[in-house]
Amino acid sequence: MTITAQAPAFGNWLTPGDFLNFAKKIWAPVAESNIEAMERKVDELYGAACKRYPTYDTMVQNAFCASMDAAFGTDEQAEGVAEVFAYARDAYGYMSASEREAQRQEDADNGICSHGLDSMTCPCGCFEND
């Protein structure tokens, strides 16, 4: 690292203003990387899903995954988004549409509705015709 700024000194003491001006020349603001911006977007998408469905984990998961697909597409290996999908999987358990469908089928086989609830707890009437 090469420092090209000179700190003005008055009697071997820097004033607070001198110090701040000197520091600004050394540590210029670092621009947020594209991946950091996309990870922040993933965090925002998950937060929005949690606000929309605060008591239903399955609904949060479904809403988050759908919003990820809408924001970044469905190709997890596409150039520029592979890292974001890896982050979403690691941080929030992102699942592709086919994985969500397989999970829904497994849940249905175990008596769980699409809201992640059973016949005794689902207020949406999912089991009324059973």
Swiss-Prot record:
Any one annotated GO CC term: cytoplasm
Name where it mostly resides: cytoplasm
Keywords assigned: Cytoplasm, Plasmid
Localization, UniProt: Cytoplasm
Lineage, top-rank taxon, reads Bacteria
Q: What does this protein do?
A: Modulates RecA activity.
Stated family: Belongs to the RecX family.
Annotated protein name in UniProt: Regulatory protein RecX
**Gene behind this protein:** recX
